[in-house]
């Protein structure tokens, strides 16, 4: 009797160890599969149109703590999953009667918000280099390999990057649209434009990197440019020498000193003058009688004192009164403020550029980078922005090599990591619409009608309206040193507001550089064309909710000795 009992006991002990081993193996395998699925599922999101549905894998991973919360700020999260606003402990944050704060913790709402490459339907496509077409050398002559190692680049008129599908023809077309003569490719993914060839030609073997999207085509190397001429036959290239009318302006006192180049020609036209100035890489073409002048905006000719266009009317041979001139914007970019770099030494002051999503943070970064000459960083990574020239996107956000760091975070711990911050505020009505458009159609697109008419829009407003308010309240409460900037003031009074921002960043900037920024103020991230959704998207209930938050933020700003919100924020 004892022997069978002993055997049974021995078997059960072995079974316990076996079950323990199988359980550990099961948990380890499940964790590895979860991580692998998360990595595979995120790129697949690129192929699907934007919606507000949560990613199950990302949600599970966040719940078990396997993935970094910064990589899972999913813009497509279902509103049912969005956590809500903590009860703010400060007197300034008391909720006025009638405002219903959501019931869950807002930290999850911030965590699920994502500025990641995979969140943007307009991000780089999944098509790899293998699917690209053959090289397009016939669309422009290959001029050779050139060195660009100096501080001052020769080809700097237009710059963009594409880490996944850069081709020779892609760069040529981009330069042709801006009326440049030469297109240079560097490091396999960088495109530069200009009207003058670099001075130093090197061996063809030194341009040994293939284009990221075109096997067999050389796209330069580190500090080496493969330069092509831009052919007029480029498909997709716009008409050359087009110009945009800027207005009628008084002539400066010293024309010769203010206008760098000129020509006189009978029956000179806008296109002729624009072409002449574009070839010389000037952003302004000025017409006065039969004379054509080329110039940059300067303190002596700042384009801020426009007069009635009738004074420059072209009804006579003299073409208007002698003291006035017509000014046109050429397709050529003002290059005096396009040079940017990382900080030479790590910054001692860690500065945030904080805003609610949709408040114009990317546009503000464009202005700051071109004004200071230093890259801005980001708490997130957005491949689309990197491809558009925001090189700081790839730098670690805590590297301190950038002039400031973009963030939409608003928790106490996240705020207190920064020594100071520029707090960018925008009208919540416009911010909500802008962010909804970005979620559904990318940085430059518009959400289709089906999204506005679905349950997604009211759920989005109910979840995000409170975040707009709590974001400002938290930064006012926990921020160590703040500069409050209103988006509307930045747009209406760009140079004075930008000058204040640059001073806050402790950078000295010339007036010419600020005027250059003003001349290039739009950048590449403004939605073009008319909004296709003309109807009022906000219901009376939505307006009541948002208006309550506006009053709360306005009072909080005043309590902290800041001016209140602009008048256009006043409840509708």
From Swiss-Prot:
Carbohydrate attachment residues: 105, 254, 345
Superkingdom: Eukaryota
Topological region Extracellular: 36-572
Xref: SMART domains: WSC (SM00321)
Reaction catalysed by this enzyme: a ganglioside GM1b + 3'-phosphoadenylyl sulfate = an 8-O-sulfo-ganglioside GM1b + adenosine 3',5'-bisphosphate + H(+)
Record key words, sorted: Glycoprotein, Golgi apparatus, Membrane, Repeat, Signal-anchor, Transmembrane, Transmembrane helix
GO terms, molecular function: sulfotransferase activity
Gene3D superfamilies on file: P-loop containing nucleotide triphosphate hydrolases (3.40.50.300)
Compartmental location: Golgi apparatus membrane
Residue stretches spanning the membrane: 15-35
Membrane topology according to the record: Single-pass type II membrane protein
Family label: Belongs to the WSCD family.
Role this protein plays: Sialate:O-sulfotransferase which catalyzes 8-O-sulfation at the Sia-glycan level using 3'-phosphoadenosine 5'-phosphosulfate (PAPS) as a donor, forming 8-O-sulfated Sia (Sia8S)-glycans. Displays selectivity toward glycolipids such as GM1 gangliosides.
Protein name per the record: Sialate:O-sulfotransferase 1
Source lineage: Eukaryota, Metazoa, Chordata, Craniata, Vertebrata
């Amino acid at each position: 009797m004892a022997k069978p009992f002993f055997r049974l006991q021995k078997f059960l002990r072995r079974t316990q160890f076996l079950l323990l081993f199988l359980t550990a193996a099961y948990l380890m395998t499940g964790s590895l599969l979860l991580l692998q699925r998360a990595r595979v599922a995120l790129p697949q999101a690129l192929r699907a149109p934007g919606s507000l549905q949560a990613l199950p894998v990302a949600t599970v991973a966040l719940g078990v703590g396997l993935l970094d919360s910064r990589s899972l700020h999913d813009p497509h999260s279902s509103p049912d999953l969005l956590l809500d606003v903590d009860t703010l402990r400060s007197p300034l944050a008391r909720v006025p009667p009638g405002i219903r704060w959501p019931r869950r913790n807002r930290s999850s709402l911030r965590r699920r918000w994502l500025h990641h490459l995979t969140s943007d339907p307009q991000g780089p496509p999944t098509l790899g280099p293998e699917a690209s077409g053959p090289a397009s050398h016939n669309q422009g002559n290959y001029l050779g390999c050139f060195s660009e190692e100096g501080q001052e680049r020769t080809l700097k008129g237009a710059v963009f990057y594409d880490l996944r599908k850069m081709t020779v023809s892609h760069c040529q077309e981009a330069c042709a649209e801006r009326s440049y003569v030469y297109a240079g490719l560097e490091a396999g993914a960088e495109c530069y434009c200009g009207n003058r060839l670099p001075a130093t030609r090197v061996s063809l073997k030194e341009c040994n990197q293939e284009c990221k999207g075109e096997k067999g085509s050389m796209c330069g190397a580190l500090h080496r440019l493969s330069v092509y001429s831009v052919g007029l036959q480029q498909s997709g290239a716009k008409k050359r020498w087009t110009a945009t009318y800027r207005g009628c302006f008084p002539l400066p006192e010293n024309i010769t000193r203010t206008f760098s180049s000129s020509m006189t020609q009978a029956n000179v036209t806008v296109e002729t003058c624009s072409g002449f100035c574009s070839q010389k890489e000037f952003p302004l073409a000025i017409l006065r009688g039969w004379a054509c002048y080329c110039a940059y905006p300067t303190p002596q000719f700042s384009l801020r004192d426009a007069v009635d266009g009738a004074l420059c009317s072209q009804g006579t041979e003299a073409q208007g009164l002698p003291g006035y001139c017509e000014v046109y914007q050429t397709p050529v970019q003002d290059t005096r403020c396009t040079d940017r770099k990382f900080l030479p030494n790590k910054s001692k002051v860690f500065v945030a550029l904080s805003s609610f999503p949709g408040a114009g943070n990317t546009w503000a970064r464009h202005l700051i980078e071109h004004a200071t000459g230093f890259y801005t960083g980001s708490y997130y990574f957005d491949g689309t922005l990197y491809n558009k020239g925001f090189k700081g996107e790839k730098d670690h956000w805590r590297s301190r090599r950038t002039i400031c760091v973009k963030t939409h975070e608003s928790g106490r711990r996240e705020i207190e990591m920064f020594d100071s911050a520029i707090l960018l505020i925008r009208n919540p009505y416009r911010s909500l619409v802008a962010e909804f458009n970005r979620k559904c159609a990318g940085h430059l697109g518009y959400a289709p009608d089906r999204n506005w008419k679905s349950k997604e829009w009211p759920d989005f407003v109910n979840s995000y309206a409170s975040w707009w308010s709590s974001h400002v309240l938290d930064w006012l409460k926990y921020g160590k040193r703040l500069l409050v900037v209103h988006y509307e003031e930045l747009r209406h009074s760009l140079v004075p507001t930008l000058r204040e921002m640059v001073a806050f960043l402790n950078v000295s900037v010339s007036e010419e550089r600020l005027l250059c920024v003003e001349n290039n103020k739009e950048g590449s991230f403004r939605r073009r064309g008319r909004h296709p959704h003309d109807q009022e998207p906000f219901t009376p209930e939505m307006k009541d909710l948002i208006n309550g938050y506006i009053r709360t933020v306005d009072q909080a700003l005043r309590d902290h000795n800041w001016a209140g919100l602009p008048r256009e924020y006043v409840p509708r």
